[in-house]
Amino acid sequence: MKIKILSLLFLTLLVSCMQPIPRKPVTVKTTSFMEASVSLNKALNENEEKAFYEIIAKDSLSNYISSPSGFWYKYNTRSTNLYTPKFGDQLLYTFDVLNLENNIIYSAQETGLQTYVVDQQELVEGLRNGLKIMHEGDDVTFLFPSHKVFGYLGDENKIGINQSLIYKVQLIKINKKNESN
């Protein structure tokens, strides 16, 4: 019995004194993934830009404006109002969403009258930036690249992944933050 206990202690001592063998780290090369992702996004942006130029060329009677935010727009009806929405203003607007072939995805009747408090509510980036350049009474058509609207996910309903969209927006009313309603 004593011999078994002593041999067990000796074996435990021997095993505990061994140095752990270091493992080599697994090398993950993320650069190849990143390079592939960058080239895919560049190709997507080029295709979207080409499609926008084709739409603009077909609509030669309209004057499209390139925004610093990365989308194109034209005025269908331009208001004489000079005030543009500021932080905290409440906007009332309607909009249609179309694909690049001018087929309606969501109509203004489906989406109804919308309210948005500027920079205090969630809204797709393109529409958020587009509303900020409008005046009360304006009717504007926006050409949004996919990364300015629903991007890689789509809306999980009618809008597909990486789908560029046309928004036709009517800004009905701007309730200024400082005005008492």
Task: Give the ranges of each region predicted by the language model.
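Sec-dependent bacterial lipoprotein signal peptides
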Residues: 1-17
